[in-house]
């Protein structure tokens, strides 16, 4: 069952779901809560790697990933990050999210941004039960013009569903959880897959 706005407010008030900083109640609508853009970004830098062999030896994949991803880019509160047509970038939500083991979250982009060609998440929009940390966004500009993205702008909306029970292996308790407690735009850690 997906939570409605009054349930989202109650779950936030009771500490069952936590968003830090907590959005005001006017950011909770129908069945979603707005989330804002943080100030941490990563981009693909100019590189000479012809490809990334996703099923190759872990050390090779790790070295290839390291060669193509930038260091973390932090921008000021009043600055803009420009995403050009055809570019992919990673960013984070301003809010850190904490979910219990019996609730799953979903991130959706905003229709108004999609109509300009901005995809907020390429495929990863599920927030696992037991998640704790900021949400990394996989931005892609499929439009024709560069887009100026600024910290604190509303970038998407979260919705929540109650599971049929408590997950036996929530994200926060898994030893192999690659993105546990992430607070910045963490690059792919596919080389850590088992």
Swiss-Prot record:
It comes from Pasteurella multocida (strain Pm70). Catalyzes the deamination of dCTP to dUTP. It catalyses: dCTP + H2O + H(+) = dUTP + NH4(+). This is dCTP deaminase. The active site is at 138 (proton donor/acceptor). Homotrimer. It comes from the Bacteria. GO terms for molecular function: dCTP deaminase activity; nucleotide binding. Pfam families: DCD. It is an enzyme of class 3 (hydrolase). Its EC number is 3.5.4.13. DCTP binds at residues 110-115, 128, 136-138, 171, 178, 182. InterPro entries: dCTP_deaminase, dUTPase-like_sf, dUTPase_trimeric. Belongs to the dCTP deaminase family. The gene is dcd.
């Amino acid at each position: 069952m997906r939570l409605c706005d009054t349930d989202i407010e109650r779950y936030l008030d009771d500490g069952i779901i936590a968003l830090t900083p907590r959005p005001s109640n006017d950011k909770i609508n129908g069945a979603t809560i707005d989330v804002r853009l943080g100030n941490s970004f990563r981009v693909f830098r100019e590189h000479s790697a012809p490809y990334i062999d996703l099923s190759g030896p872990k050390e090779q994949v790790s070295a290839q990933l390291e060669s193509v991803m930038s260091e973390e880019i932090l921008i000021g509160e009043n600055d803009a990050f420009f995403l050009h047509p055809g570019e992919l970038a990673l960013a984070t939500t301003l809010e850190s999210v904490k979910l219990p083991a019996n609730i799953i979250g979903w991130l959706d982009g905003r229709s108004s941004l999609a109509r300009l060609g901005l995809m907020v998440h390429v495929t990863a929009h599920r927030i696992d039960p037991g998640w704790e940390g900021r949400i990394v966004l996989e931005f892609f500009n499929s439009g024709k013009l560069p887009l100026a993205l600024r910290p604190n702008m509303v970038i998407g909306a979260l919705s929540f569903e109650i599971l049929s029970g408590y997950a036996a292996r929530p994200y926060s308790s898994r030893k192999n959880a690659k993105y546990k407690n992430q607070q910045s735009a963490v690059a792919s850690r596919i080389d850590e897959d088992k």
